[in-house]
Amino acid sequence: MTARHWGAAFDPDELGRLETRMWKAYYRKQPARLFGLLVQAVRAQAGVSWPRAIAGSVLLTKAAAGFSRATGDYERFAPDIVRGYRMLGLPEHVDIEAVARHELRWWVVRREIGLAAGAAAGESITDLYAAIYDLPRERVAEAGRLRGLAAEVRDRGAAADPDGSTGRGAAYWPEVARLLRTSYRSLRRAIDEGAAEVEGVADETPAQRDASVRATP
């Protein structure tokens, strides 16, 4: 299982904090700050070297920047997302093309649905996590739902704020930060539980495995 080898050791509170700061930088049009935070977040989650974190972030930023200016034909950004994820050292059995599709999809649903996109974005994020971590969708559904909800809270808050996306956002950013922290805690818990199950199976003796098979109806 992927969780035993890749991206299993991140600090969920730190990752939530970094993503909150990334979103603020994105909406406040601070590209240099956004890139620096993305490099930190990639390194924190994937555990890769600084050169790989930077290279992967360059490709993911290129895709995100292109998407932000686009009005259609969004699939053309998938190749850069694929290359970006490939730099992060995902295991060979992970379908990186599928990972990129799910990553891009949650960007697209927010663009197409608008302020009510939280649930649809959460579904796409759930698919993304299931593909990356090789876990059943139901294990990571809560993490996906909460991150999608965080995006909707941000979008609705900014829409209602007289200062728009570039303002302080005191009415909504604290809730966004809380949802992202809770989302990453849920994801980390799902990864840890999945890894523990795999280790438990690996530690079983042949006799125990045979007994389990015989006990299965």
Where are these regions (language model features)?
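Hydrophobic/aromatic side-chain positions at a characteristic register within alpha-helices
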Residues: W23-Y27, A65-R69
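Solenoid-like repeat scaffolds
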Residues: R4-P12, Q40-G47
